[in-house]
């Protein structure tokens, strides 16, 4: 199978390190998912958690979007709740709802029931990573895990929440239990990442999907130490992404991220200015723009690319996951456009943010 996959020119890893690359690398969050007919055929009715522990299915579902889209990276097919299930937490993933927990965690005794993650329970995942590294033949494999706050929110609320009110109530009213919970979750997610790294992933991404619900001061006090513990000293490039986290971008970098993922709400030139010197960013096309006519979509993709040049490095991605009704052909066209546009600019020597916007535009200011 490896002979039908594109060879990596190292663009993604170079950008993660803040080095120049011949093209802007591109991959998509949730690129392995229901937008692909081959995904639907391969997974069938297999429950999500079961699929995430089936070695051969993990391999197949991870490779499908690389074959289809010719992206610059694969991301391991999994779910952020998998290490919780492996740590003895009773949960199920309900279609259209998300993870649902039978026993919410709201007291110190509840935290004590969450076991440390045993690597022995990860055998199918570790074996899948090793097989994938061979199949991908040089294309980077991204591993991932959930950030402590987002996992805690699911556990405390018992499932997805709009306002995270129960989570915040615990955070404010019982900080000892709160910090004990996040400390345990940081250990679990870190072990999950280290097992993937030891098996061969080249990059990791930490998803803090719900951190945007927090005031920056609360993030700094109640969350940042635990995200920092999770990310500290990992021996591969680290991407940190959250939704609605425009006010947290500098802190996402400060807790240990090499690359900061940006959702579609914040222009990348603005994000680069907020993060500061040597910012490397990932994102951030609105996932819904893929349904627009091609001239509109092309203009939006080009705008993301140009704004991304205000940062030291840019990985093109969506600002959140691929929507299930997305046309795979459109994503393939985006990949081709990103590669062609950025290769041409690299060969000719950039049109900079100043060239595109003028010296008074924020993108030009961020570009310095």
UniProtKB/Swiss-Prot annotation:
Gene3D superfamilies: 3.20.20.210. Keywords: Cytoplasm, Decarboxylase, Lyase, Porphyrin biosynthesis. PROSITE patterns: UROD_1, UROD_2. One of its GO terms (cellular component) is cytosol. It catalyses: uroporphyrinogen III + 4 H(+) = coproporphyrinogen III + 4 CO2. GO terms for molecular function: uroporphyrinogen decarboxylase activity. The record marks 79 as: Transition state stabilizer. It comes from the Bacteria. Pathway: Porphyrin-containing compound metabolism; protoporphyrin-IX biosynthesis; coproporphyrinogen-III from 5-aminolevulinate: step 4/4. It is found in: Cytoplasm. Substrate binds at residues 30-34, 79, 154, 209, 320. InterPro entries: UROD/MetE-like_sf, Uroporphyrinogen_deCO2ase_HemE, Uroporphyrinogen_deCOase. One of its GO terms (biological process) is protoporphyrinogen IX biosynthetic process. Its EC number is 4.1.1.37. It is an enzyme of class 4 (lyase). It holds the Pfam family URO-D. Catalyzes the decarboxylation of four acetate groups of uroporphyrinogen-III to yield coproporphyrinogen-III. Homodimer. Belongs to the uroporphyrinogen decarboxylase family. This is Uroporphyrinogen decarboxylase. It comes from Acidothermus cellulolyticus (strain ATCC 43068 / DSM 8971 / 11B).
């Amino acid at each position: 199978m490896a002979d039908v996959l594109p060879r990596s020119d190292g663009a993604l890893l170079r950008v993660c390190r803040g080095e120049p690359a011949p093209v802007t690398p591109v991959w998509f969050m949730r690129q392995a998912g229901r937008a692909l007919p081959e995904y639907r055929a391969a997974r069938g009715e297999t429950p999500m958690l079961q699929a995430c522990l089936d070695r051969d299915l993990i391999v197949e579902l991870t490779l499908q979007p690389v074959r289809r889209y010719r992206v610059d990276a694969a991301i391991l097919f999994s779910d952020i709740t998998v290490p919780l299930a492996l740590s003895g937490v009773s949960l199920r993933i309900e279609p259209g709802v998300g993870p649902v927990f039978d026993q919410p965690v709201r007291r110190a005794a509840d935290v004590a029931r969450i076991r440390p993650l045993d690597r022995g329970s990860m055998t199918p995942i570790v074996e899948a990573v090793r097989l994938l590294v061979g199949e991908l033949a040089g294309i980077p494999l991204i591993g991932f895990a959930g950030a402590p706050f987002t996992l805690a929110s699911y556990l405390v609320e018992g499932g997805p929440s709009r306002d995270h009110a129960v989570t915040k109530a615990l955070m404010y009213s019982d900080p000892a239990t709160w910090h004990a919970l996040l400390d345990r979750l940081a250990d679990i997610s870190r072990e999950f990442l280290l097992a993937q790294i030891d098996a061969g992933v080249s990059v990791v991404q930490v998803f803090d999907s719900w951190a945007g619900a927090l005031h920056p001061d609360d993030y700094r006090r109640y969350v940042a130490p635990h995200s920092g513990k999770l990310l500290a000293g990992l021996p591969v490039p680290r991407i940190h992404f959250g939704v609605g986290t425009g006010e947290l971008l500098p802190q996402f970098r400060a807790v240990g991220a090499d690359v900061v993922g940006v959702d579609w709400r914040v222009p990348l030139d603005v994000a680069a200015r907020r993060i500061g010197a040597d910012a490397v960013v990932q994102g951030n096309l609105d996932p819904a723009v893929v349904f627009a006519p091609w001239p509109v979509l092309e203009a939006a993709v080009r705008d993301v690319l140009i704004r991304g040049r205000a940062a030291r490095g840019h990985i093109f991605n969506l600002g959140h996951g691929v929507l299930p009704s997305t046309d795979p052909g459109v994503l393939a066209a985006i990949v081709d456009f990103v590669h062609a546009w950025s290769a041409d600019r690299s060969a000719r020597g950039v049109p900079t943010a100043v060239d595109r916007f003028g010296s008074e535009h924020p993108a030009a200011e961020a570009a310095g």
